[in-house]
Amino acid sequence: MDTKIYHDEDADLNVLKGKKVSVLGYGAQGRAQALCFRDSGLDVTVGVRENGPSWKKAKEDGGMTVTTMDKAVKDADVVLMLLPDETQPDIYKEFVEPNLKKGAALDFAHGFAITYKLIVPPKDVDVIMMAPKAPGDAERQQFVEGFGVPALIAVHQDATGNAKKIALALAKGLGSTRAGTFEVDNFDYETKSDLFGEQAVECGGLSKLIETGFQTLVDQGFPPIVAYFECCHENKLIIDLVTQGGMAYMWNVCSNTAKYGGLTRRDKVINKDSVDGMKEIFRQIDSGEFKTEWRQEWANGLKNLHAMMDDESKLQLEKTGAEVRALFQRKAN
């Protein structure tokens, strides 16, 4: 499947000039996008809880209208839902749905609420996604340095005939068309691939691999600090190499011993059982089973999540990691 990649010449920021662009939420993603849009010359309104920490921060940043969410949505031409997945449905119902005008564009940075029909917008608005592929602080830093981070766009609903142009204009306002903005056919591709990556690889899979490797060496009598360096700390070196030049480049930089040992032993760790587990993870995402479980967890006050996070914080890996980080923070006398 070919993926179309767009650059600056493919996007027109004038599509948004003279329009009211309202950003709901002022966390890492909301603040980064709002500031970049502001610096790109757009008329930005930030919608947050009155007099809360985000309200005060947005006021301090300046150059934007700061107001409540309902007022931010009213008369807005573009509304960006830059809020946590779990809070979006309630905020949409209370503040967005009653105030969203006909012909407006509703933008998401993650497709969860649309994919699983937790939000069902009216047919007379555009529904788009502009999803930067980086955390908010990295987006802002790249923009300030005159570049941008790659982004993904998708159109779920094109009521005006301009939905794609608006999505590309938002990407340009963030600097993402300088890097490259790629288009997918629907929100599902972003939603399900993002969830899968988080659960099976980036957050779930990698953390478990690190924890298990560390504990294996400790159980064999190795000093925890040695186990930490080998099974956790040095992962950054490998990821940096892959990011810099790809997987083959990483292998070429490694010693011959590391190459041979890694290539001949990796299937003992990631094997058919692992593949079956990944397929089951995807099945639960694809069927909506994970969505239902996550919504129930949120409704129950995140009790299981808090308990699991507490358990993670007590791992020997965490204590050893703090000791290792302290070594790198020592200052010369």
PLM regions and their residue ranges:
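Glycine-rich adenosine-cofactor-binding loop
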Residues: 20-33
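Rossmann-fold dinucleotide-binding core
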Residues: 107-199
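NAD(P)-binding Rossmann-fold cofactor-contacting core
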Residues: 32, 38-61
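Rossmann-fold NAD(P) dinucleotide-binding segment
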Residues: 69-119
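A short, basic/flexible loop-to-alpha-helix module at the beginning of a structural domain
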Residues: 1-18
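NAD(P)-dependent Rossmann-like dehydrogenase/reductase catalytic/cofactor-binding core
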Residues: 222-333
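Active-site-proximal catalytic alpha-helix in oxidoreductases
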Residues: 161-165, 175, 180-220, 225-243
